[in-house]
Structure formats: C-alpha cells, structure tokens
Amino acid sequence: MNLGIVSLFREHVDSIPNILPHQLATLDFLLRSILDENNSVLLFHIMGSGKTIIALLFALIVSKFKKVYILVPNINILKIFTYNMGIAVNLINSDYVLENIHIYSTTSFYSLNYNDNVINYNGLAKYNNAIFIIDEAHNIFGNNTGELMTVIKNKNKVPFLLLSGSPITNTPITLSNIISIMSDEGINFSDIIIQGKKVFQILLNENGVSVLKRILRDKISYYELQDTELPSIVFHGRRFLDTRIVYCHMSKLQERDYINVRKLCNNEMFEKNMNNVSLAVLGPLNLINNLDILFQDQDKELYPNLKISNGVLYGDELVSLNISSKFKYFIARIQSLTGKHFIYFSNSTYGGLIIKYIMLSNGYSEHNGSQGTNPKTIGGRLKTFAIVTSKMKSSLEELLAVYNSPANNDGSRIMFLFSSNIMSESYTLKEVMHIWFMTIPDTFSQYNQILGRSIRKFSYTNIAEPVNVYLLAAIYADFDDDITSLDNYSIDEINVLPFDIKKLLYLKFKTKETKRIYSILKDISVNYTLPPHPQIVDVVLGELTRQFFYHHSRVRADDPELFAAIDRVLCSPDSTRRYLDEITRGHFFVCNRVFEKALLYRHGEDIIVVPFKLSHDQFLWAINFRKEYNVGAPL
C-alpha cells in the first residue's frame, strides 16, 4: 500500500461516512498493479478491515476503462455487495461507469458460461480486457467455477483481484489454486510440499518458500487492524497451548454413547456423528444420517427421561442435561452473563433440533416462535434465541437486521444467535459480548472467520469492554491433562484423546504451518511512498475535505490549514484554489460534528457548512409504466 497516502491523515475520524486511510492506500496499489501493469493481486486483509469497500471503490474507478466482473460465494453475499455498492458510490469523488460493473454469485456465473456442464468457449470472448474480482477467493476453487476461472485466466489473459482474509483454508495445498491463478508459471506442487501421513503434516518445504516469495512478490497486499481499533479478547477455561478451553466432563450416560459411536467411526476427524455426540447424545438417533427420521417417530423413547414425537423432543433430560456436558455448562453459565451471544455449532445432523428444545426447556423463547418453559425475561421482554442453518438463507437478512439493531445492543430482542457454517464468511455481527464454540472448527481459517464475524472494526461502540470467548470441549470424566506443548503426545497417543481435544491439537498443528506461511506473505506485501496515483487523486482530496470539515463549520476560503492539506496532494497553489472553488460551487457533501449532514457553500470570503434535510412527497406506491412517467397514489 502507499504509505504516503496514510501519512496525509492525522487522527482520522472513523465515525462518519468515510474511506479509511489504509483503504485509500490499498486502492493506490491496486491501480498501479492491476490497471497499469495488468498483474493479479491477492488482497490479504484480515477479517473486518473493509475488503468489500476497497474492492467496490476499485471497481468504480476502473469501470471507466474496463468491464469489471465481481464473483461472490452466494446470493446473500451478493446482496451485501449490492448494498455496499451504494455506500461506495456515495463515498467516491470520481467518475465511474456503473454499467460496466457486473456482480454475480458463483452459481449464476457458472450457469451463464456452461452448456450441459461444458464450458461455452465461444462465449468467453466477452471477458477480454476485463478485470475479475473474486470474493472469498480461498473457497472458489476445487469446483467448476474454479475451473472456469483458470480457463478465463489462460484464454483471456485478464488480471484477478482475489479477496481473502484467510487464503489457506486447511493446508498449504489450498494455496496452490491462488498461486496458479496469479501466475503464468507452471508449478509442480510435489516439489514444494512435504506430504506426511496426517493432514496436519502437510508442510511447505524450503523450495516452496522460495517459489512462494518469487511468484507472489509485489502481488500481495497485507493488512491487519491495530489492537487499538478492536476490543480485547478474553479466553475462558484452562490453559491449552497458547489459548484456553473449557473442559466439559461428560456424564456416564453421554460417555457411554459417545464411546460406542467412536468405535464405529473409521476416520472420525471427518465423521459428523462424532460432532453430534460431542454436542449431545440422542440414544438410538446418534448414528442417523437423515434428519427426516427425526420427524417420523411417534413417542419414541431415547432415554428414560427423553422422548421424541414428530420431531419434538421433550422430557426432564433437556433440563438435567446428562445428554450434553457442553450445554450443561452453557446453560449454567449464561444465567449470570449480560449482553449478546454468538454460538457456533456444526449442524451435522440434529444440532439445530437439540439446541432448540434445550433452550425452550430452560426458559429461553424462540425468536418469532415458541415460548420457553417458565420464560426468562430482560427488561420485561422474553429472552430469545435464533438458530441459523443453511435452510434459512432467505430470511437471514431480516434476522440480522434485528440482531444488529441498536435496540438489541443489550440482547433484549435476540440474545442468543446460534449459527452453523453459513455465518462463517462475509456477515457482520455487532455488539457481541460472548462468542461460544460448541463445535471445534476444522481449520484455522474457519476459526478466524467465525471470530471475525463479531470482532471487527465498527462492530463495537465501546472497545474498552472485552469480548469473552469460550471453546468448549466434551471430555471423558477422568480426563484432566494439562496440554502445554504440541510435543506432549505422539501421533498414536493423540488418536485416543477425546475427540474435541484431538481436533484442537490437529487445528493447532495446522495453525502453526498456516501462520508460518502468512508471515511469508506479510513479508512480501508491498509498501511504498509515492504521490497518489492520478486516478485516485480526487478520491484522496475528497476524504481530506471530509475530515477537515468534520471539525470546522466555517473557515476563510484561503484558510491556511485547509489550503495546506489540499496542496500537499496537488502541489500547485493554483490547482488547490481551483479545487476549493469547485467543491463549494458543487456543494460537496460532508459530515460535521455540530451540524451532521451538510453541504459546502461559499458565503462571502468564507466556506461554510449548511445542514440539510431531505423531504419528499409521501406516496404509498409508485409504478414506472414508462421511463418518462411515474404514477403514484398519495397517502
């Protein structure tokens, strides 16, 4: 990034609509690398730092010269990008051609370019002289869309902007797709990878390090938020390597079923049944692979105090919780906690079902659903929960609007948000004070993505208050090991540890290698100091103007401080005077700390901010019958 741009801003005010200094500095780098040099770039910015806005601002700027195709993982994220495009348009102080920007979900882009599962090569010519922006780039490969991107790259010779907060999803092998899309050089990955027997033993060798540095040098933009921009994190439980976890000792009932299921698992690291029984046991249903089975039984006894009928669980066991050591801890702990909770779990088969009836049985009511037994309240309102799974994508936006609303900062509208992997990327959660892992994530990337939904810039009004994180592990009743080093156990010894402990150790092994590679990417990230790129000058000047008039309501037209701020970029007194004249004649939009939304006006020898308020005729509906006419019905 261009550190020269960052140096233009002192004590940048982030609380108003603005473009952050690091975003402007990154835009400068993208323009030089992609627009000028036709090189691909990996935008490796840690979650919550504003990659989406950077990508959209870049798309707007280059839309004057090229067509831009933006690919996102799914329709919900497409809606997020479309919404943020409106924000980017309002922020950018530059010309653009919106018709040249096309945003697709990967599935819709696939359907546009395939006929009967075969790439339509004749139709690829339309992508000549284009730029592709790939959101969550680490997840797009290994399928037909990834294959299509490789074909377009080789056939059309177009540059790619790859967005990722975690470019290694599992092992270093997953980085190979990103390298291949960013380079014309063929790579034999067996030459750069050390392949062990276990997945966490896949390492990048010394030759691989050299290849990585050579191919990706000058093609990486790395950024992570400063500690001062985020709340601190407090991990709860006992020490486990470099973090803490909560040991949840299983009851005899849970441990018996847990051991029986484990004996039947050939490769338990990939067995969803182990995720099931680590969360909770359901007797005869522990090994089911089809949720429909849960809705077929009539009054089936699972345990003496737990039955299921038509998909409804009932019985005292939902309160005594011998079926789940994790929920026994969770239910007991939350009674003394205040604020909102975000709870990650794997919905392997029956996760969502067991959560629903445990919460209802313990007095917590379902958002827009059933009321809990002896319902608990906060400020006269029911304490409620919501469960997000892949089956509720269509209503997720409405749910998050309630959860993130200022009225819900205390959790009085929705206190507990349970979510499976659907919430692991691109979504933002606000004012979450407690983050729970009911299931141990499979990868370091997934773990970071889940934390990154909540712990991100602008998600907290008070960053002085810490965020609490609970990693829950279901363990045997007699397990009490202190794990302080990855060298504590041999591979054979790891295999007989409780499933969650084994999974955590695997995660930490993979994390160690991932962090090593991330350090390499950080080291080859590009930083420089230059005047702003010509295509970004107006955007930089616009942000300098916004920052200045946040603090000032009225200044002389030749105010030395204002003049100096603008002239540092233009380096021409005449050009600076013309710019100041243009923004007053054009009534540039600013946010002032006194008057809030305002426009700039010239008043005699002064420049003043004039607050405004939009008003409009009230209509119940309007129909655009023709482009020239609108017909409306007044209220």
Curated annotation (Swiss-Prot):
GO cellular component: virion component
Quaternary structure (record): Heterodimer of a 70 kDa and a 82 kDa subunit. Part of the early transcription complex composed of ETF, RAP94, and the DNA-directed RNA polymerase.
Binding residue positions for ATP: 45-52
Enzyme Commission number, as recorded: 3.6.4.-
An example Gene Ontology molecular-function term: DNA binding
Domain Helicase ATP-binding: 32-185
SMART domains (UniProt xref): DEXDc, HELICc
Main location: virion
Known function: Acts with RNA polymerase to initiate transcription from early gene promoters. Is recruited by the RPO-associated protein of 94 kDa (RAP94) to form the early transcription complex, which also contains the core RNA polymerase. ETF heterodimer binds to early gene promoters.
Placement of sequence motif DEXH box: 135-138
InterPro entries per the UniProt record, alphabetical: DNA/RNA_helicase_DEAH_CS (IPR002464), Helicase/UvrB_N (IPR006935), Helicase_ATP-bd (IPR014001), Helicase_C-like (IPR001650), P-loop_NTPase (IPR027417)
Gene3D superfamilies to which the protein is assigned, alphabetical: P-loop containing nucleotide triphosphate hydrolases (3.40.50.300)
Family designation: Belongs to the helicase family. VETF subfamily.
Record's protein name: Early transcription factor 70 kDa subunit
Location of the protein in the cell: Virion
Top-tier EC class: hydrolase
Keywords: Activator, ATP-binding, DNA-binding, Helicase, Hydrolase, Nucleotide-binding, Transcription, Transcription regulation, Virion
